[in-house]
């Protein structure tokens, strides 16, 4: 688009008829430097002001194209400008001389100058007498001072002081520099509607006149206009429209507009500067529409009201409210420079880094640890980035809880503990302790366990070490550079809290091997980690520990001193380590396991890691539980168990080992295992020969077999010091060395000759051993694995055909080389090659050459033991194999067939002992019926220590303090609302005398605040109850008749809805739940709900006593009224009623009533006297009330029934055991149970006199012993049972909660079962069935009118029936299980005699030994299996004659097949 400003300016300048020096020259500065102030479309058509100088009026008449409307505006503006009023204090005046001078110059430009200004820029100063072509507003005759661009005339560049044209370029303090602006603002505010109407008229007039003005002003030539396409034409017109819409003088701007622009100026400064700098290139359509919409909704809301609404609770903001997302309010700066951007960025960066560092806090520190000592100045309390919560870490795991890893633990102490305890050692030698170590090994070997123990060890004592735990994926992020930033923050925080430890679990996922095929992100992370661990910056006292299962996957650059100084192999534990681990896991068992059993168990657990051994102990305990109490698997309720009767046996561990698959054997089976008990007598002699040869070939095996707690390092340290050792110090340093100086004769003796000394370590030259023999001699199946089991302390690398060809991604040569590399890295080690003859024939020549090359490359004295087996004779092996294993060096051991003595030991146990064993008899426990276990009582809560109680009370008090602050804010908000003034104070009784007669519980907001101060509210629910009470009182006292009453009712409902809405919107549900838990916990602990008692006049109901001490005091005072069968039962006491309930004993349910409010002490005493009299009358009628210090689990306190429906009563009415009724009705017992769901209705059921003494005693026994809920002060009597007898049948009705609370019928029946003798268990089972039939009896008859039995509610009847059905189903399940497993006792018959011909068995043994002379080991095993099957088939026979005959036939038949 072509800029036509200057061209049109020249045209206007040449046609200007008005006087004045240089109109054309004077218009150009005005076109580019005019003021840019504007007002919105709502006020653009308002009346303008005239010029303040007299010359302006004279110049206004000389304008060529001034319309009548504009002339009228000139007169109005002139009148406004005459009334000069001082502006606000912040709007300073400019010098009047320059103003007049500029106005005189602008006057000479006339209308042409005005049009040029309106089309030149977005926000321009309006010129005299012009009308904008867009029709939005008119221009005043008074010209604003111009910021002229000095291009030819110096006089035209005069500026009004330091007044700038552009809004973004001028000084903000000169923004409202006009005398008449405040007058215009006042006038526009008062005449908004008139301005809008005039605006619409001006739009229509100027829209019709726009095309004529364009032609008259010669904006474009005809050719140029016609050549433009429609798109360019429309766009050009829209830009002209947008420019002219802001071409209004600054002094016409509304002050509220300016203030609102100032509040948004920080967000819009950059856009305004760009838009005004580009002038014609950027439209303002969106901004125009937004401004128009803002001023169309009257009235204008003041800014301070909006601010007050958003910051209602900013003074005492607590976590009880949700955090609302608030709009950031930018500050208004007077500086127009951007020099503070860098400083602002640095401040934001520092705050962001501080917040991120605070999230990287150690996992072994708690809030109290960080708030104490020097750590208080280092960090602030925050959350850890690791997925390990400090509360979830087992604090009991210490170094003494780890078995078999003493070497690793000592190394960790050298790295972490010793630099703190003995810094003088490191200072003396000027050394730094190792700062990095790498844990690697199979899964479950204790890598993470050692890290946990280290974290707990670092948390002890005065010098605590910060422990940071990260997994490999914790630092990864999808954002570019975020992973590196997290690593840098982690090391930064660790450096601030030094000494510290960073543990990277599964570090292979964080720092894999870098390669060309790898993603660049991982390469960057690895590079960052390398630089952080050992870069230019000193890492300081930061120990880095990494753990991985795949050592080869870690980048090799990490595996060097300075980064990971040490590498610890966590191999599978050997027998000694396994025994230690078993001792650790079973040290708290009672009774403890014997040392001999643990040793044998450790020997059997070959290939088990630490996690497997722990799982073995757990599985064995569960099997013992399953064997002792199988009933618990058939019931979903907790049953009473005798834990002391659960005793583990060796059989439990055996079955557990059958169920567990070791982690190391899930993918690859272990190569070594001990000789089985069956095969040991047969191959024990051969195995001992192998061990003897092994000591010669591979002397390092002695270290593995020794039970002493020593290794090579300890052998060196315990060795006697060589007195003849040479000094390693300089000759002049006599005082520093205790050694004698070297003589001239011994100069050439090497200093480091310890490796050649046989006193320090065993020496072996290429240790190799080949077990050769006939096929089936047991060298591969039994002897070699047993030998590897003996050497299990060494790492074993299996080199067989599956190891070469199982991985398709590797070639056999590569797999072979990999195995040798691993063997050389973990010396001393073993390379195991089973079936070497078959292996040599199967592999290719390349693999053979690779194997021989790698074997020869092993150093001569390197302790790498090559163990091989061959199923062929040594003479039949290939020559290359014979060259590897030499007979003359005792590297070949020939396995011979078992001799006669070995075979006799092998078959002796089977023939003489197993075949002559009597048949097994059923155990006495199996013959008896399964024991029906009673339901268990809920266990009492754990007793807290004094410190825990105090800490918990402090936390609860802090939470309740936040709740009170929130409730005060809500109450203040309601009280200060004018609509709710009538509820802010109590009702004046003098004005409304009958108020207390209608309203029994008055409530107002001032009383609510008082209750808040007295700590009466533990939850927001209690607060809302009083708000609802205010509403209900207003609705009850003010009928819906008069208009005034209707207003009060409307405001009461509004008060209720407002309070509920505020609570629902601003109260955090988690915080509310926490308050509910606090209230429930305090009720369970026996504490009163409120810390201060409410005044007597505020309640009209009886007070509730909930103190446990008072309950026990009443228990001692009235021993006959206490049920004392269990230590966990509720404490009952006979108490005096506080209000009249005389008609309750007659079985009549009436609407609950409350006493009137008492205003003084005398009325209260009088009511107490009446209640006491009422109690005496009740006692005379055979009734009294038993009150319990029990509360329901829903958290409501037992108290006033008239307050809320959520409060329930635990009152129980019963007859004293020593009292009898005089009316001959027999024993009378009344029970009252009030529940939340029944709206405070009591249930009184009277048992008939037809109950026999046995049933009565059972019921009394239940009342004494089975009122249990797990705690002494928290029992709820919702489930009080009621026994009814209708038509001679017994019916049990109860109301039991669910879950842990058991029904009363269960307790009655199970208690009867526990009292009966065990020998009559079958008869008791029949009694239970009769009781179940009694339970099925329903009460179908109507009650007599004069009876004392209360009619039950329909809902309660259904609930009671459902509970009875539930219990009946439980009893039937146990009865069904019992009947299934019940074995009828067989009549006692004499045990038949055992017939065994032992002499015949001995002959069979001799025959068997003779016939198996030439049999191999595998053939002997097959014969043993056949004989074992014969014994199993005849295991129930008392006459073993047929067994012996079948065994003889088996021996002869086996010999025939051979």
Swiss-Prot record:
GO terms for cellular component: nucleoplasm; nucleus. Residues 951-1066 form the Bromo domain. One of its GO terms (molecular function) is histone binding. The gene is ATAD2B. This is ATPase family AAA domain-containing protein 2B. It comes from Homo sapiens (Human). Residues 1-155, 244-286, 321-353, 1189-1208, 1217-1257, 1309-1330 are annotated as: Disordered. Belongs to the AAA ATPase family. Gene3D superfamilies: 1.10.8.60, Bromodomain-like, P-loop containing nucleotide triphosphate hydrolases. Residues 943-974 form a coiled coil. Residues 116-129 have a biased composition (Polar residues). Residues 23-33 have a biased composition (Gly residues). It is found in: Nucleus. Residues 321-332 have a biased composition (Basic residues). Transmembrane segments: none annotated. Keywords: ATP-binding, Bromodomain, Coiled coil, Nucleotide-binding, Nucleus, Phosphoprotein. Disulfide bonds: none annotated. The modification Phosphothreonine is found at residue 221. The modification Phosphoserine is found at residues 16, 79, 81, 86, 140, 318, 939, 1338, 1347. Binds acetylated lysine residues in histone H1.4, H2A, H2B, H3 and H4 (in vitro). ATP binds at residues 441-448. Residues 256-279 have a biased composition (Acidic residues). GO terms for biological process: nucleosome assembly; nucleosome disassembly; transcription initiation-coupled chromatin remodeling.
């Amino acid at each position: 688009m072509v800029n036509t400003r200057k061209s049109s300016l020249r045209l206007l300048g040449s046609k200007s008829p008005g006087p004045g020096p240089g109109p054309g020259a004077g218009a150009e500065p005005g076109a580019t430097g005019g003021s840019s102030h504007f007002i919105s479309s709502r006020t653009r058509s308002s009346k303008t002001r005239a010029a303040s100088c007299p010359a302006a009026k004279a110049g206004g008449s000389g304008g060529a194209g001034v319309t009548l409307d504009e002339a009228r505006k000139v007169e109005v503006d002139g009148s406004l400008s005459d009334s000069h009023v001082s502006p606000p204090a912040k709007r300073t005046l400019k010098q009047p001389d320059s103003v007049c001078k500029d106005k005189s110059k602008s006057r000479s430009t006339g209308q042409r100058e005005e049009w040029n200004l309106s089309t030149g820029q977005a926000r321009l100063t309006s010129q005299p007498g012009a009308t904008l072509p867009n029709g939005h507003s008119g221009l005043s005759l008074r010209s604003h001072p111009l910021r002229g661009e000095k291009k030819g005339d110096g006089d035209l560049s005069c500026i009004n002081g330091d007044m700038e044209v552009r809004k973004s370029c001028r000084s903000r303090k000169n923004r409202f520099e006009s005398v008449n602006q405040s007058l215009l603002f006042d006038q526009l505010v008062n005449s908004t509607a008139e301005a809008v109407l005039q605006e619409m008229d001006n739009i229509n007039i100027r829209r019709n006149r726009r095309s004529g003005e364009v032609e008259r002003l010669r904006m474009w030539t005809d050719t140029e206009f016609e050549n433009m396409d429609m798109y360019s034409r429309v766009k050009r017109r829209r830009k002209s429209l947008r420019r002219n819409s802001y071409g209004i003088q600054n002094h016409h701007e509304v002050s509220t507009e300016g203030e609102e622009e100032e509040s948004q100026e920080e967000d819009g400064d950059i856009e305004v500067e760009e838009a005004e700098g580009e002038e014609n290139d950027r439209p303002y359509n969106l901004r125009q529409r937004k401004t128009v919409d803002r001023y169309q909704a009257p009235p204008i809301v003041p800014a301070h009201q909006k601010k007050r609404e958003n910051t209602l609770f900013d003074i005492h903001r607590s976590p009880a409210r949700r955090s609302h997302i608030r709009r950031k309010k930018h500050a208004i700066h007077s500086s127009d420079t951007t020099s503070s951007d860098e400083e602002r960025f640095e401040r934001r960066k520092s705050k962001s880094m501080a917040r991120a560092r605070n999230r990287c806090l150690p996992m072994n520190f708690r809030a109290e640890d960080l708030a104490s000592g020097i750590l208080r100045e280092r960090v602030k309390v925050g959350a850890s980035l690791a997925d390990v919560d400090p509360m979830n870490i087992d604090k009991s795991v210490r170094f003494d809880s780890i078995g078999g890893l003493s070497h690793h633990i000592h190394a960790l102490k050298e790295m972490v503990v010793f630099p703190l305890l003995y810094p003088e050692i490191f200072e003396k030698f000027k050394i730094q302790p190792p700062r990095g170590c790498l844990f690697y090994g199979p899964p479950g070997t204790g890598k993470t366990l050692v890290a946990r123990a280290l974290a707990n060890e670092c948390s002890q004592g005065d010098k605590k070490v910060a422990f940071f735990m990260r997994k490999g994926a914790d630092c990864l992020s999808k954002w570019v550079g975020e992973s590196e930033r997290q690593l840098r923050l982690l090391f930064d925080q660790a450096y601030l809290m030094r000494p510290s430890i960073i543990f990277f679990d599964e570090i292979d996922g964080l720092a894999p091997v870098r390669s060309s095929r790898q993603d660049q992100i991982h390469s960057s992370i690895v590079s960052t980690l390398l630089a952080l661990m050992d870069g230019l910056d000193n890492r300081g006292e930061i120990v880095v520990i990494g753990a991985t299962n795949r050592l080869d996957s870690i980048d090799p650059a990490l595996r060097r001193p300075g980064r990971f100084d040490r590498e610890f192999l966590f191999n599978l534990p050997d027998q000694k380590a396994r025994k230690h681990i078993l001792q650790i896991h079973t040290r708290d068992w009672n009774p403890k396991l014997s040392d001999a059993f643990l040793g044998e168990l450790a020997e059997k657990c070959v290939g088990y890691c630490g996690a497997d051994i722990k799982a073995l102990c757990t599985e064995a305990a569960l099997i013992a539980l399953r064997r002792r109490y199988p009933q618990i698997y058939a019931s979903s309720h907790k049953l009473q168990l005798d834990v002391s009767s659960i005793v583990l046996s060796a059989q439990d561990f055996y079955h557990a080992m059958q169920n567990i698959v070791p982690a190391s054997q899930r993918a690859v089976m272990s190569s070594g295992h001990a000789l089985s008990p069956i095969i040991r007598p047969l191959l024990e002699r051969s195995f001992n020969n192998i061990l003897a040869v092994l000591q010669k070939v591979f002397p390092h095996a002695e270290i593995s077999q020794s039970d002493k707690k020593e290794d090579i390092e300890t052998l060196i340290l315990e060795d006697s010091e060589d007195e003849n050792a040479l000094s390693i110090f300089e000759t002049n340093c006599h005082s520093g060395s205790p050694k004698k100086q070297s003589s001239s004769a011994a100069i050439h003796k090497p200093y480091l000759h310890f490796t050649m000394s046989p006193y320090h370590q065993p020496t072996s030259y290429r240790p190799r051993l080949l077990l050769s023999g006939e096929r089936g001699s047991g060298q591969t199946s039994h002897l070699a694995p047993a030998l590897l089991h003996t050497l299990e302390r060494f790492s074993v690398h299996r080199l067989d055909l599956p190891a070469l060809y199982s991985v398709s991604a590797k070639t056999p040569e590569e797999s072979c080389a990999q195995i040798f590399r691993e063997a050389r890295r973990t010396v001393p080690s073993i390379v195991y090659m089973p079936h070497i003859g078959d292996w040599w024939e199967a592999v290719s020549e390349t693999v053979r050459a690779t194997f021989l090359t790698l074997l020869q490359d092993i150093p001569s004295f390197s302790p790498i033991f090559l163990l091989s087996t061959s199923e062929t004779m040594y003479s039949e092996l290939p020559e290359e194999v014979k060259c590897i294993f030499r007979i003359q060096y005792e590297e070949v051991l020939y396995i011979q067939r078992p001799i006669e003595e070995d075979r006799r030991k092998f078959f002796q146990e089977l023939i003489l002992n197993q075949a002559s064993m009597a048949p097994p008899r059923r155990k006495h426990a199996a013959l008896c019926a399964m024991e029906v276990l009673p339901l268990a009582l809920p266990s009492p809560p754990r007793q807290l220590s004094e410190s825990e109680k105090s800490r918990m009370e402090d936390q609860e008090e802090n939470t309740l303090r936040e709740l009170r602050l929130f409730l005060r804010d809500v109450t203040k908000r309601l009280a200060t609302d004018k609509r709710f003034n009538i509820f802010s104070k109590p009702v004046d009784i003098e004005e409304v005398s009958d108020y207390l007669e209608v309203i029994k519980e008055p409530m107002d907001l001032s009383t609510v605040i008082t209750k808040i101060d007295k700590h009466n509210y533990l939850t927001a629910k209690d607060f809302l109850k009083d708000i609802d009470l205010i509403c209900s009182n207003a609705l009850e006292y003010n009928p819906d008749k008069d208009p005034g009453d209707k207003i009060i009712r409307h405001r009461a409902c509004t008060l209720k809805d407002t309070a509920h809405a505020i609570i629902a919107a601003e109260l955090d549900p988690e915080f509310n739940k926490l308050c509910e838990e606090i209230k429930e916990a305090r009720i369970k602990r026996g504490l009163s709900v409120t810390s201060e008692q409410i005044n007597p006049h505020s309640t009209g109901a009886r007070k509730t006593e909930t103190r446990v001490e008072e309950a026990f005091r009443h228990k001692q005072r009235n021993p006959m009224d206490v049920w004392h069968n269990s230590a966990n039962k509720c404490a009952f006491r006979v108490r005096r009623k506080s209000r009249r309930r005389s008609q309750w004993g007659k079985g009549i349910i009436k609407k609950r009533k409350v006493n009137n409010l008492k205003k003084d002490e005398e009325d209260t005493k009088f009511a107490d006297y009446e209640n006491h009299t009422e109690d005496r009358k009740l006692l005379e009628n055979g009734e009294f009330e038993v009150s319990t210090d029990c509360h329901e689990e829903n958290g409501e306190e037992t108290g006033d029934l008239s307050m809320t429906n959520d409060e329930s009563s635990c009152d129980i009415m019963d007859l004293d055991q020593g009292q009898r009724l005089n009316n001959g009705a027999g024993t009378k017992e009344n029970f009252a149970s009030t529940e939340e769901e029944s709206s405070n209705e009591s249930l009184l059921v009277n048992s008939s006199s037809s109950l026999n003494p046995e049933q009565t005693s059972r019921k009394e026994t239940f009342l004494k012993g089975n009122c249990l809920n797990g705690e002494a002060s928290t029992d709820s009597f919702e489930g009080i049972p009621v026994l009814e007898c209708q038509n001679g049948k017994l019916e049990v009705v109860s109301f039991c909660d669910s879950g842990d609370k058991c029904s009363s019928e269960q307790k009655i029946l199970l208690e009867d079962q526990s009292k009966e003798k065990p020998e009559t268990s079958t008869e008791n089972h029949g009694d239970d069935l009769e009781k179940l039939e009694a339970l099925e009896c329903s009460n179908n008859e109507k009650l007599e009118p004069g009876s004392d039995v209360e009619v039950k509610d329909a809902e309660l009847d259904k609930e009671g029936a459902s509970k009875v059905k539930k219990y009946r189903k439980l009893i039937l399940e146990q009865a069904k299980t019992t009947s299934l497993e019940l074995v009828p006792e067989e009549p006692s018959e004499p045990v038949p005699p055992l017939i065994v011909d032992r002499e015949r068995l001995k002959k069979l043994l001799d025959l068997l030994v003779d016939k198996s002379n030439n049999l191999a080991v595998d053939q002997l095993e097959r014969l043993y299996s056949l004989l074992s099957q014969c014994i199993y088939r005849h295991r129930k026979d008392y006459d073993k004659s047929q067994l012996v005959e079948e065994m003889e036939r088996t021996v002869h038949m086996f010999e025939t097949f051979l």
